[in-house]
């Protein structure tokens, strides 16, 4: 697991305006805990609790958004050159039936659904957003975002829980989603 944290600052004032925390699970990487003579040992640390992929209550809001079939190509124009998103042979070699939609695009679709359903299309109200990607999304699929109101963390904020399901496959692709909305700016 690699964890990166980055803080974005206003160019003029220097004030922090956003903090980004990115977790990457490096599948099939590792083997650094030993030498060829002494194979690596598994960690004795307890396993993390299982991730909950269901929501017991019916959602307060449901938003369906269709991803564009050409979305992966648009993201490639943004300097993401990972061939997994555009090359069918690379996708198959990695165990996927076809190229994947970028995680950032999936994340953006979930964000859009929350802002549309709960913030009257005012993106300045979004204070935080976190997700767990639980399955791949393919370009052209429909993402259904199911949103539940939660207890507010602080006065003046609105806490939300959500998940995203690909309608065509009935697969949960974002689980354990959390968002916080604030007052309009």
Q: Where are these predicted regions, by residue range?
A:
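Residues within alpha-helical segments
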Residues: 104, 111, 178-180
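A contiguous, surface-exposed recognition patch within enzymatic or periplasmic domains that forms
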Residues: 40-106, 113-116
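Hydrophobic beta-strand-centered segment that forms part of the acyl-chain substrate-binding groove
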Residues: 97, 106-144
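Residues that form or immediately flank small-molecule/cofactor binding pockets and catalytic motifs
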Residues: 27, 79, 136
């Amino acid at each position: 697991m690699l964890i990166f944290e980055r803080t974005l600052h206003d160019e003029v004032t220097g004030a922090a305006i956003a903090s980004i925390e990115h977790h990457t699970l490096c599948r099939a990487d590792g083997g650094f805990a030993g030498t060829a003579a002494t194979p690596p040992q598994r960690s004795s640390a307890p396993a993390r609790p299982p991730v909950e992929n269901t929501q017991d209550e019916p959602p307060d809001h449901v938003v369906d958004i269709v991803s564009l079939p050409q979305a992966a190509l648009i993201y490639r124009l943004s300097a993401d050159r990972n061939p997994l998103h555009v090359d069918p042979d690379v996708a198959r070699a990695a165990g996927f039936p076809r190229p994947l939609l970028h995680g950032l695009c999936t994340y953006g679709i979930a964000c859009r659904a929350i802002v549309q359903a709960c913030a009257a299309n005012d993106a300045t109200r979004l204070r935080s957003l976190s997700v767990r990607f639980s399955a791949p999304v393919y370009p052209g699929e429909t993402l259904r975002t199911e949103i539940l109101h939660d207890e507010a963390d602080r006065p003046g904020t609105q806490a939300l829980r959500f998940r995203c399901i690909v309608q065509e496959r009935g697969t949960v692709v974002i689980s354990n989603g959390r968002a916080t909305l604030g007052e309009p700016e």
